[in-house]
Amino acid sequence: VRALLFDLDGTLWDPEPHVYRIYSDVFRDHGHELTRSRWAGVLGTIGFDLWGSLEELTGRSLDRAVLDAHVARRKEKELAVLRARPGVPGLLQQTDQAGLLRSVVSNSPTAWIRRYIRQCGIEGGWQAIHSPEGDTNRAKPTPYLYREALARLGVAPHEAVAFEDSPSGVRAAHAAGVRCVAAPNAMTTSLDLSLAHLRIESFEGTRLEEILHRIESDPRRADDDGTSMKKHKTPDDVCL
């Protein structure tokens, strides 16, 4: 293994319960419930029309600009106190000590990624940031971002390991031929992460050496020989 590829939201830090509560409150203010099952379909994806779902429930059009502004204000306030998930800084330190490459592979916009890795105190040491910048054709669960990350780092799929918290992210890594460690949070722990090669419930006390040993010992191997990566042309990405 030469490189580790990390999802951001829900993996390196965990804003998911807060974001779910914010949207749930909006639904409740309009007389409806945003169920956990409906929210599970949103996690790790982009382009899902939550306001469209709310309009269907209420039977009327909503001022989406007002709703977006309300959600943005609450996110600005409530996410400001969050830091990296416990154990994440230590795992990144172990990654650097082992001489491994690392990149962020996230569906969030680059500006969001930069802001919150800085807030979490983990902004240093990344070789690159990979974001679809709102393009659903490049976003997880498609393998595009992972193939882009592999090409940028110059590593083959079997030389990388991904860390993800959601089914969408795990599927994206799997489709790119990258072995995956599932590190679910409270919002994703009950979801189907069975495509992952390894599951850990917490980063606290995690030894990278042990994780990599268990990954290498898994009888399931990435079936991508790298040809898909070679055939997949990628645009320039944003590098820290």
Question: Can you describe what each PLM-predicted range is?
Answer:
Residues 1-40:
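Active-site neighborhood of HAD-like aspartate-dependent phosphohydrolases
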Residues 1-2, 93-96, 100, 110, ...:
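Asp-based, Mg2+/Mn2+-dependent phosphohydrolase catalytic module
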Residues 11, 106-108:
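Conserved phosphate-coupling serine/threonine residues in phosphotransfer and NTP-handling enzymes
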Residues 12, 84, 162-163:
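Conserved SAM-binding loop
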Residues 24-27, 46-61, 116, 149-150:
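Helix-loop "lid/cap" segments that line or gate small-molecule binding pockets
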Residues 32-34, 60, 122, 154-155:
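Helix N-cap/coil-helix junction residues
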Residues 33, 53-93, 98-100:
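Metal-dependent phosphoesterase signature
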